[in-house]
Every structure is written in C-alpha cells, then in structure tokens.
Amino acid sequence: PMALVPGVSPRLWIGNAAKVAIHHDPTENIAVVGAGRRRFTLLPPEQVGNLYMGPFDPTPAGVQVSMVHLTAPDHARYPRFAAAMAAALIAELDAGDAIYIPYQWYHHVEALDRFNVLVNYWWDPVPDASPWEAMMHGFVSLRSLPPDQRRAWRAMFDRYVFLADGDPGAHLPPEARGVLGATSPQAIAQMRAMLFDGLRKRLRR
C-alpha cells in the first residue's frame, strides 16, 4: 500500500464477507477498498446515547462496540437505535474507492463479497494527549459524586475544557492566565507534573 498520509504506516486487512460491529476509533481514518465491495455506515458522536454501546472493558478489539446488530436490529430491545440510523451516512465502496471517517465517528463496516481487501490509514491529530485517560480519571473522581456536585463540575468542564463560552481566560492579561493561557510545550509539561504529583500522593494513601 502507498503512503497516502505522510508519516502514517498503512494497515492491510484481508478477509471474507464479514461485518465489523458499530464502534469508534480515537483517530482520524481513511479506509481504501483494495478488492471487493464494502458498505460503510457512519454515525456522528452525538448519537452515542442511541447506540447502546457495550462495556469499555473487556472488549473484542480494545474499543467499545454497539450491542445492536445493524443489519438485523432488535427495535423492541433497542428502541432509540432508529433515531441513530436517521442520522446515519451510508456509502457503498468498490475496489479503488476510499472513505474518510472523522475522529470518533461511530461506524459499521460490512464486506459484501467473499474476498475483500481493505487498507486503513489511522492517525492521531494530537498524539501526545489521551482523552481516554482523562475519561478514566473522570470515572474515578467524578462519577460517584452527588448530583449537585456533578452538575457543578460539568459547568466547570464546559467552560474551561470544552470552551462552551469562548476563551475562559480572555479577561485576564496573558501573563496571568496560567493553565488558561496558550497551550505550549512548557505549559503541557507543567500540567503533567501537577497530574503526576497528584496521582503519586493518592497512591501513597
């Protein structure tokens, strides 16, 4: 396979008329059909509540998968799945065709022929960061809080992490913004040091 994305090694998949359950990857993804035909069903991340995802662990391939069989859904058991499919994008690819799957978009892949070849190019736009680790820390530190405290932290995350109201440090002079300022290697190193220090203290308890 050619080096379609600079610095990204392609991965080659050879198989039969198989199906890949609905899942998402924490990467950007370009999939190229080398042989056979494949049907891709893409669903935006906002549909997570309608997809009836399985556990985070254990998983068949390291990522969550939906409990719904897309080609034969049980709508009585999974009634919200119809709403997810209303937002779906579906593409059928022949050999030589390619599809871009955006970061964290859910997708189902169905190989339509008895012999199929697929080439994947996965890359992480921010390779030094791990939102998954942040989420795991949230499971430990936030999920068991009382509802009023979770609401308070949700407001904090919306403002300071997800920037729901714009730049939360815009009213401060640049030299006083601290972790609210521009993300630089030095700032990232400082925040990581704070995280490591906090984890070390908790592990000693």
Model-derived features: where do they sit?
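Double-stranded beta-helix
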Residues: 5, 17, 33-100, 105, ...
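Conserved, well-structured core segments
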Residues: 12, 29-32
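Internal glycine-rich, Lys/Arg-flanked active-site/core loops of soluble domains
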Residues: 1-18
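A short beta-loop-beta micro-motif enriched in histidine and acidic residues
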Residues: 7, 19-29
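A short hydrophobic beta-strand segment most commonly corresponding to one strand
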Residues: 53, 113-129
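Conserved double-stranded beta-helix
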Residues: 90-93, 134-205
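Short glycine/proline-enriched turns and hinge-like loops at secondary-structure junctions
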Residues: 23-26, 33, 43, 111-113
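A generic "binding-loop/recognition-motif" signal
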Residues: 18, 26, 105, 115
